[in-house]
């Protein structure tokens, strides 16, 4: 009798793991990691220029008025998709400071030449140190920073046309 029971044990284990896998596949998952830095001041940073066309970026650049901080990269396909919306925000008077992640100067310049340049400054974060310090987990991500340098809002993923009013409203709230 004991030997027969052991013959069924592999089948029972397989059924258990198959059931567990099936259950996990039916559960909702959160694909976005929200920053724990919302409501906190930007960490101190001073990044060199991402290319020769614009100055670098630092925490001091966020004083005075609300601004957008856009985390992006030339190798990021969703960053191409959001380029027209960033241009639209710039056309409405929004100052956008960029941080290019793990990028080369020539690639940054080429990207901006092809898709437009909505940025007043772009810092080069070659090892993603600042990106991680502000709680960004990917590219693109955009943060609303208030006039005192406090992170007020995080937009995860590329900015779509339908997201522009929300970002403008968050900038207004950050006054």
Locate the predicted segments by residue.
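A short beta-strand-turn-helix
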Residues: 45-67
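Hydrophobic beta-strand anchors of alpha/beta hydrolase catalytic cores
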Residues: 68-69, 96
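N-terminal targeting signals for export/organelle localization
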Residues: 1-48, 175
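Structural microenvironment flanking redox-active thiols in thiol-disulfide oxidoreductases
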Residues: 80-116, 126-132
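Short gly/ser/thr-rich secondary-structure transition/capping motifs
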Residues: 27-28, 48-55, 122-125
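Aromatic-flanked redox-active Cys/Sec active sites in thiol-based oxidoreductases
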Residues: 70-75
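Thiol/disulfide oxidoreductase modules built on the thioredoxin-like
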Residues: 113-118, 125-175
């Amino acid at each position: 009798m004991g030997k027969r029971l052991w013959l069924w044990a592999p089948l029972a284990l397989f059924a258990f793991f198959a059931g567990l896998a099936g259950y996990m596949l039916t559960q909702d998952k959160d694909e976005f990691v929200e920053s724990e830095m919302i409501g906190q001041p930007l960490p101190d940073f001073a990044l060199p220029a991402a290319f020769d066309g614009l100055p670098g970026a630092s925490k001091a650049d966020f004083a005075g008025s609300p601004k957008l901080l856009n985390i992006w990269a030339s190798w990021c396909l969703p960053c191409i998709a959001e380029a027209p919306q960033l241009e639209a925000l710039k056309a409405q008077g929004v100052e956008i400071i960029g941080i290019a992640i793990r990028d080369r100067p020539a690639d940054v310049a080429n990207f901006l030449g092809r898709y437009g340049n909505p940025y007043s400054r772009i810092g080069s974060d070659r090892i993603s140190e600042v990106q991680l310090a502000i709680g960004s987990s990917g590219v693109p991500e955009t943060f609303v920073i208030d006039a005192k340098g406090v992170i007020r809002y995080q937009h995860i993923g590329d900015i779509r046309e339908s997201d522009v009013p929300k970002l403008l409203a968050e900038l207004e709230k950050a006054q």
